């Protein structure tokens, strides 16, 4: 999908102020919020309603997740994030899912990312549970079986892989282990690699940096009329490659040259990172924007993530 098409979707994203949340110091933006509402009743009628809506179907920009942030009675952090891989809004149901998504979305290996992927038909997961002697999750009132989901199904050039994101402490709970065992059996039958990802495998510093970079999606629309994003970006990149000036100084010079509002110079840097026009920045460490760069063309030391998929 072209960048211009992706940027058009940006207005659909609800931006909020960053807040501190637990020990991770970050509530990821782009729609992140703490949800607390009543869950819709789950029964046969609700199931067929979601099926008729096309939930869990489609690929790329046409995919519809089985669960959206509007469906859950969650008290955790949920997010809506515009993805660069698919050009659509992704529904992420925890801060760990959001962090992991940023890492997946930045990977050159990812061709498609489908979150909240339903394990259908539901009769199959019920049969798996019965075979394993495990209780299948059901609504406590209607007793209708819940449709189980896998957090992410990622398409690569080698095929699909499935990933479930869980806190390591959750893995000690019997009911969590049972649900994961059903998942494992479901994907094993399809000969698709399935793995569990915990907070121990997620590079949170890289996710934070990527979240910061992603704020520049609508950069072309931020510029004054008559000023082209490509022209400003080329000017910034020229200074970046030919001088050892700190990023902040290049940003200020860019603002002076084009008469931009304060802050847009730094947004130009973010935009260049988003477009992967600055290849040598290590996103696994805090970005140094104020020091003199020792090597021309180096931003410090973006390596784009090639793990987990």
Feature map (PLM): residue ranges:
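Electrostatic, structured charged patches in enzyme active sites and in nucleic-acid/phosphate-binding
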Residues: 2-309
């Amino acid at each position: 999908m072209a960048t211009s098409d992706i940027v058009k979707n940006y207005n659909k994203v609800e931006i909020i102020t960053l807040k501190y949340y637990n020990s991770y110091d970050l509530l990821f933006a782009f729609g992140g919020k703490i949800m607390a509402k009543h869950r819709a009743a789950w029964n046969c009628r609700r199931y067929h309603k979601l099926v008729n809506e096309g939930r869990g179907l489609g690929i790329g920009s046409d995919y519809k997740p089985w669960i959206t942030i509007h469906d859950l009675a969650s008290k955790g952090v949920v997010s809506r994030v515009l993805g660069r891989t698919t050009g659509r809004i992704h529904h992420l149901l925890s801060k760990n899912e959001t962090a992991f998504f940023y890492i997946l979305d930045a990977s050159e290996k990812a061709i498609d990312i489908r979150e909240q992927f339903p394990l259908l038909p539901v009769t199959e997961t019920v049969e798996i549970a019965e075979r394993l002697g495990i209780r299948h999750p059901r609504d406590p009132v209607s007793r209708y079986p819940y449709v189980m989901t896998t957090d992410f199904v990622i398409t690569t050039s080698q095929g699909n892989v499935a990933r479930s994101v869980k806190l390591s402490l959750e893995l000690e709970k019997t009911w969590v282990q049972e649900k994961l065992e059903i998942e494992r059996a479901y994907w094993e039958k399809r000969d698709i690699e399935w793995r569990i990802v915990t907070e121990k495998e997620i590079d949170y510093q890289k996710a934070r940096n990527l979240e910061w970079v992603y704020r520049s999606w609508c950069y072309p629309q931020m510029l004054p009329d008559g000023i082209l994003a490509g022209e400003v970006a080329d000017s910034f990149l020229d200074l970046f490659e030919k001088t050892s000036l700190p990023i902040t100084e290049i940003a200020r010079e860019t603002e002076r040259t084009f008469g931009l509002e304060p802050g847009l110079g730094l947004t130009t840097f973010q935009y260049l990172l988003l477009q992967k026009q600055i290849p040598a920045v290590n996103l696994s460490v805090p970005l140094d924007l104020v020091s003199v760069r020792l090597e021309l063309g180096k931003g410090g030391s973006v390596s784009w993530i090639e793990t987990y998929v």
